[in-house]
Curated annotation (Swiss-Prot):
It comes from Xenopus laevis. Pfam families: zf-A20 (PF01754), zf-AN1 (PF01428). Zn(2+) 2 binds at residues 156, 159, 180, 183. The keyword Metal-binding applies. The gene is zfand3. Residues 42-149 are annotated as: Disordered. This is AN1-type zinc finger protein 3 homolog. The keyword Magnesium does not apply. The lineage of its organism: Eukaryota, Metazoa, Chordata, Craniata, Vertebrata.
Length: 226
C-alpha cells in the first residue's frame, strides 16, 4: 500500500498550457514554440525603437547648428540704384519704336485678304479655259466640209503612201477617205464619222421586238389549231 501511494505522489506533472491552447514549456516561458518565436521577433523591434529616437535627436542638433551657421553668414548688399537703370531700359519702350511696328502689323494683316481674293480670281480664270475644251469635245465634231477632199484614192490621205487595190478596199473609211493599214482605224486619223452612234442605231434596228397581246381575252390551247 505504501508503494502505491509513493508512485502516485511521484507521477509526472502535466506541462503548462500556452494562451493559444497548445502545450507550452518552462524553457520557453510557458509558451509554445510558435508563440515564443513571435515573442522573440517583437523584442528586437522594441529595442530598436528607442535607438532610432535617440539617433534622430542626435541629428536634429546638427541641423539646427547648420541653420544657425547659415544665418550667421553675411549677405552681400546690393545698391538699389544699380538695378533701377536696367529695369528702366528693359521695361520702358518708347512710343516711337512701337508706332511703326503696329502699322506694319496692320499692313501685314490686311494684305493677305487682298492676295486671297486675287488668287481666287486667278484660279477661276485658270479653270475656265479647261472647261471650254470639254464643251467642244462634248459637242458635235466638225463636218467633212472643213477637211479638204482626197485627190487620189490610191494614196493614204494621212501619209500619202501608195496603196494597192486590196489596201484601198480595206482602208476605206465611212468618213469618205482612204487610209493605209497604219491609219485606217478611226482613232488614228481623227475620224469625223460617229461610229458609236451609228452602231447604236443599227443595234436598235436589229433588236427583236416581241408582240405582246394586251387584253383580258383567254384562249384555250388547241382552239387555234381546230
Amino acid at each position: 500500500m505504501g508503494d502505491t501511494g509513493s508512485e502516485r505522489s511521484n507521477a509526472p506533472s502535466l506541462p503548462p498550457r500556452c494562451p493559444c491552447g497548445f502545450w507550452g514549456s518552462s524553457k520557453t516561458m510557458n509558451l509554445c514554440s510558435k508563440c515564443f518565436a513571435d515573442f522573440q521577433k517583437k523584442q528586437p523591434d522594441e529595442d530598436t525603437a528607442p535607438s532610432t529616437s535617440s539617433s534622430q535627436s542626435d541629428l536634429f542638433p546638427s541641423e539646427t547648428d547648420s541653420d544657425n551657421g547659415n544665418t550667421s553668414i553675411p549677405t552681400p548688399t546690393v545698391n538699389p540704384t544699380q538695378q533701377l537703370p536696367t529695369e528702366l531700359n528693359v521695361d520702358s519702350p518708347s512710343k516711337e519704336d512701337c508706332g511703326p511696328c503696329t502699322d506694319s502689323a496692320h499692313v501685314s494683316l490686311t494684305t493677305p485678304s487682298k492676295r486671297s481674293c486675287d488668287s481666287d480670281s486667278q484660279s477661276e480664270d485658270d479653270t475656265s479655259p479647261m472647261k471650254r475644251p470639254r464643251l467642244l469635245d462634248s459637242g458635235d465634231r466638225p463636218d467633212n466640209s472643213s477637211r479638204s477632199k482626197q485627190k487620189s484614192r490610191r494614196r493614204c490621205f494621212r501619209c500619202q503612201i501608195k496603196l494597192e487595190l486590196v489596201q484601198q478596199e480595206l482602208g476605206s473609211c465611212r468618213c469618205g477617205y482612204v487610209f493605209c493599214m497604219l491609219h485606217r482605224l478611226p482613232e488614228q486619223h481623227d475620224c469625223t464619222f460617229d461610229h458609236m452612234g451609228r452602231g447604236r442605231e443599227e443595234a436598235i434596228m436589229k433588236m427583236v421586238k416581241l408582240d405582246r397581246k394586251v387584253g383580258r381575252s383567254c384562249q384555250r390551247i388547241g382552239e387555234g389549231c381546230s
